[in-house]
């Protein structure tokens, strides 16, 4: 964004401050205070530096106005105040003498805009220095995920052993063995880490803020490519009028340096195999929601991994080459989420298959997704962005205007063929730019799956200039016009995925999975009282399956307290909890009904 000049007239002369419209107005005031302090006039020609009583500093749009305290502009940007290049503001303040002290004031502040409007803000001003007021407004008070709270307390420093270059004892430290920050570029390249972790990126931004010595401002600010249809800066709303305040800036797309989630782990291989079996039996594709939890990933500094404990398959119509999602009853989906939350699980992503038999009769499948074709199609990228917008990440370091939301931890996993014909999962997210492009309705799919089409402007959508930037083989940055299409890979963020060497899943056995009635074979029964009876008879006290719990809740035989007893037993696997469950009235009623139904 281009720089602008704001003019400030005071009793010690006029001062010009160069800034840009996205800057926090507090940074402008800090520059102004520094110039006022160095003016050396003080109104009496004694040549000494001004000593400003910061509590008396007010800003107005007219020379006669008393104006408002500077404190009240602390959390607003130049753009939000409606200030334009060349605007004149009038500064009033008192000089501090050696025997004078701070005073408490309650003032009214107004600033003039390019259109002659004023912005009134009222309120009492505390008698503390301006820097203290600004820095006291730190991170938001929002409820973050436990993993974010845990990683926020860690420094993430990468320890290094003594090297041959060290010239000191075991208790010494030098540049060759001192810890590295978690965002270190050389470490990332040496360990083949494609993206730094979200918390490494966050700490890098906080470090930049700290080293600048400026006031606190949120280091996470989601991009917004939408035009402001409510802009009233002296013109009619778009499309009948437009100005630099309401229109989005030109967009430059580049590969995102960080990722919100670094790794996707399936708690046990049978979770994925059970999902893929639908294709093995029927040849049609399948879609599911990943329910799991977040934990630290040891492979990446300050990394996060999503551990999948179960897959829920909503109502859908499956075909050989596609999937159509049907309406999922909201009450049922809410019930699934609530039960999952009692296990400390959330929706962490989606999963779908894209498998085609290779015809070799040895279990191999076609490899359709690779660097010369695509990893996710344009429609899949847009779908992933919509899911990420639906399930936002909450961070106290984001802005209040976004309610603490910044990007998402929601993962998209596709099961497809590898280079050697093996079936393998591949996990992705899309960038914050992709989320903003979809939210602003700027992009859509096209006939070439690897390319994304840029929409045209219309009465409700303004599409700015869009470029995408990449590094060529000579190490130089090259920018290309993104219209009408650009490669979808510029919106992708890739994750790693795996299975644990020593699985410890919450749910350890199998049960009939819902919404698979169309399979109709002996290995895929429909959920019924008979399947409940057979499951309980064959497993005794080993009733550790999420789909079993959901089916049991749908029968409405057990009350809420008895369902909680069942969940507590599955979590603890304690025999005492099991005895409490089987001795309950609801469980005995269930056994009676099942015995009579056989």
Swiss-Prot record:
Pfam annotation, one family: zf-NPL4
Keywords: Cytoplasm, Endoplasmic reticulum, Membrane, mRNA transport, Nucleus, Protein transport, Translocation, Transport
Entries under SUPFAM superfamilies matching the protein: Ubiquitin-like (SSF54236)
Main location: cytoplasm
Topology in membrane: Peripheral membrane protein
A GO term, aspect molecular function: ubiquitin binding
MPN domain: residues covered: 264-403
Subcellular location: Cytoplasm, Perinuclear region; Endoplasmic reticulum membrane; Nucleus membrane
GO cellular component: Cdc48p-Npl4p-Vms1p AAA ATPase complex; Doa10p ubiquitin ligase complex; Hrd1p ubiquitin ligase ERAD-L complex; nuclear membrane; nucleus; perinuclear region of cytoplasm; replisome; RQC complex
Comp. bias (Low complexity): 99-118
Gene3D superfamilies: Phosphatidylinositol 3-kinase Catalytic Subunit, Chain A, domain 1
Matching InterPro entries: MPN, Npl4, NPL4_C, NPL4_Zn-bd_put, Ubiquitin-like_domsf
Family: Belongs to the NPL4 family.
Function: Involved in the import of nuclear-targeted proteins into the nucleus and the export of poly(A) RNA out of the nucleus. Has a role in the endoplasmic reticulum-associated degradation (ERAD) pathway.
Protein name, UniProt field: Nuclear protein localization protein 4
Source species of the chain: Candida albicans (strain SC5314 / ATCC MYA-2876) (Yeast)
Gene assigned in the entry: NPL4
């Amino acid at each position: 964004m281009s720089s602008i000049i704001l003019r400030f007239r005071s009793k010690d002369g006029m001062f010009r401050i160069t800034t840009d419209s996205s800057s926090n107005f507090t940074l402008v005031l800090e520059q102004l205070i520094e110039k006022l302090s160095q003016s050396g006039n003080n109104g009496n020609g004694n040549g000494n530096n001004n000593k400003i009583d910061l509590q008396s500093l007010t800003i107005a749009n007219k020379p006669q106005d008393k104006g408002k305290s500077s404190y009240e502009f602390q959390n607003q940007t130049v753009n939000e105040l409606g200030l334009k290049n060349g605007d004149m503001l009038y500064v009033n303040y008192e000089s501090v003498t050696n025997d004078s002290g701070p005073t408490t004031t309650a003032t009214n502040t107004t600033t003039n805009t390019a259109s002659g409007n004023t912005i009134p803000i009222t309120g009492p001003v505390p008698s503390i220095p301006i820097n203290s007021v600004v820095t006291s407004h730190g991170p938001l008070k929002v409820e973050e995920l436990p993993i974010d709270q845990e990683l926020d307390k860690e420094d993430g420093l990468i320890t290094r052993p003594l090297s041959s270059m060290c010239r000191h004892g075991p208790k010494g430290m030098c540049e060759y063995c001192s810890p590295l920050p978690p965002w270190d570029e050389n470490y990332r390249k040496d360990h083949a880490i494609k993206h730094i972790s979200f918390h490494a990126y966050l700490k890098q931004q906080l470090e930049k803020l700290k080293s600048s010595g400026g006031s606190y401002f949120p280091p996470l600010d989601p991009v917004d490519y939408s035009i402001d249809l409510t802009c009233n800066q002296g013109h009619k709303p778009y499309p009948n009028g437009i100005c630099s305040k309401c229109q989005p800036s030109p967009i430059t797309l580049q590969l995102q340096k960080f990722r919100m989630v670094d790794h996707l782990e399936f708690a046990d291989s049978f979770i994925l195999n059970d999902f893929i079996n639908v294709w093995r039996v029927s040849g049609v594709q399948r879609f599911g929601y990943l329910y799991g939890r977040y934990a630290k990933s040891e492979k990446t500094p300050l990394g996060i991994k999503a551990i999948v404990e179960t897959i829920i398959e909503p109502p859908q119509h499956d075909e050989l080459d596609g999937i159509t999602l049907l309406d999922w009853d909201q009450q049922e989906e809410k019930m699934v989420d609530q039960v999952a939350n009692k296990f400390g699980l959330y929706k962490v992503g989606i999963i779908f298959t894209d498998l085609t038999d290779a015809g070799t009769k040895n279990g191999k499948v076609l490899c359709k997704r690779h660097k010369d074709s695509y990893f996710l199609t344009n429609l899949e990228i847009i779908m992933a962005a919509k899911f990420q917008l639906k399930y936002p990440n909450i961070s106290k370091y984001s802005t209040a205007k976004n309610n603490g939301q910044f990007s998402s931890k929601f993962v998209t996993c596709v099961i497809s063929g590898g280079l050697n014909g093996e079936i393998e999962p591949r996990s992705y997210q899309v960038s914050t730019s992709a989320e903003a492009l979809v939210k602003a309705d700027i992009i859509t799919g096209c006939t070439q799956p690897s390319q994304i089409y840029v929409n045209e402007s219309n009465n409700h959508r303004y599409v700015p200039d869009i470029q995408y930037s990449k590094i060529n083989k000579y190490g130089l940055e090259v920018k290309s016009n993104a219209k009408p299409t650009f490669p979808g890979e510029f919106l992708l963020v890739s994750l790693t995925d795996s299975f644990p060497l020593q699985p410890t899943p919450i749910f350890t056995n199998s049960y009939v999975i819902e919404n698979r009635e169309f399979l109709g074979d002996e290995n895929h029964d429909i959920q019924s009282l008979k399947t409940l009876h057979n499951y309980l008879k064959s497993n005794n006290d080993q009733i550790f399956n999420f789909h079993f719990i959901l089916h049991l809740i749908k029968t409405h035989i057990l009350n809420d307290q008895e369902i909680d007893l069942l969940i507590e037993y599955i979590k603890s696997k304690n025999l005492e909890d099991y005895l409490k469950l089987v001795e309950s009235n609801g469980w005995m009623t269930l056994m009676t009904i099942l015995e009579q139904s056989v």
